[in-house]
Amino acid sequence: MALQQEIIQALGVKPQIDAHEEIRRSVDFLKSYLKTYPFLKTLVLGISGGQDSTLAGKLSQLAISELRDETGDQSYQFIAVRLPFGVQFDEKDCQDALAFIQPDKVLTVNIKEAVLASEKALREAGIELSDFVRGNEKARERMKAQYSIAGMTKGVVVGTDHAAEAVTGFFTKYGDGGTDINPLFRLNKRQGKLLLKTLGCPEHLYLKVPTADLEDDRPSLPDEVALGVTYDNIDDYLEGKQIDEKISQIIDGWYVKTEHKRRPPITIFDDFWKQ
């Protein structure tokens, strides 16, 4: 089997989807997990103002609202968490996303002081962080805050990982990649847009240029610049379409290089890294 087909199979991507069916599938998935573990009462998710967290947030709120209606248990809650590093340049998009999602509760945790304190402690130990590694520090601090909130609210941390992100490993290991449950897994980027459009999301939230915005030296660096391919390229690849050989090789390369990110910690029984 060609690598492209192996990847499509591993990530569960369909060449075509019914948006209503996929919305229902994700909502039921979240509900089923919470119903299986009745001691869990909240879904917790960081909201950045981008496409992925907006979609995951809306699906989470729909799931929680339905659970309350179906069970009569009013303790179920969706907690949206704003996690700016100082002042976020696209704060209006974040507020627009929250207005669309209508979360039960919004918490704001400014991670700047925590990141700077960590950087200072490392510097005193003789470790000077590069701008790139400092960016990963931000992502991990955001996830740490979400797990603290989840720990105090009987919660589950919801992730935003989707197929176009997974295939390239475009996430921080144990940062935004370190979550409990991923309702967007199997969808590529354009399919996520379709779900948001179907849900009535303001289009500027899913048409904006995707950026992780973690690096201070390269603020708002577009994902597509960092990856060297466009999301349309990646989506075509994941839908099984024939694409330019050079583009295909770049995507193949990202997948192979980042395999460790998609696996739990490597043990003596693993051998994928030897191949």
From Swiss-Prot:
Keywords: ATP-binding, Ligase, Magnesium, Metal-binding, NAD, Nucleotide-binding. Gene3D superfamilies: HUPs. Its EC number is 6.3.1.5. Deamido-NAD(+) binds at R140, K173, D180, H260, K261. CDD domains: NAD_synthase (cd00553). The keyword Glycoprotein does not apply. ATP binds at G46, I47, S48, G49, G50, Q51, D52, S53, T160, K189, T211. It catalyses: deamido-NAD(+) + NH4(+) + ATP = AMP + diphosphate + NAD(+) + H(+). One of its GO terms (cellular component) is cytoplasm. One of its GO terms (biological process) is NAD biosynthetic process. The keyword Cell division does not apply. GO terms for molecular function: ATP binding; glutaminase activity; metal ion binding; NAD+ synthase (glutamine-hydrolyzing) activity; NAD+ synthase activity. Mg(2+) binds at D52, E165. Pfam families: NAD_synthase. Catalyzes the ATP-dependent amidation of deamido-NAD to form NAD. Uses ammonia as a nitrogen source. HAMAP family: NadE_ammonia_dep (MF_00193). Homodimer. This is NH(3)-dependent NAD(+) synthetase. It comes from Cronobacter sakazakii (strain ATCC BAA-894).
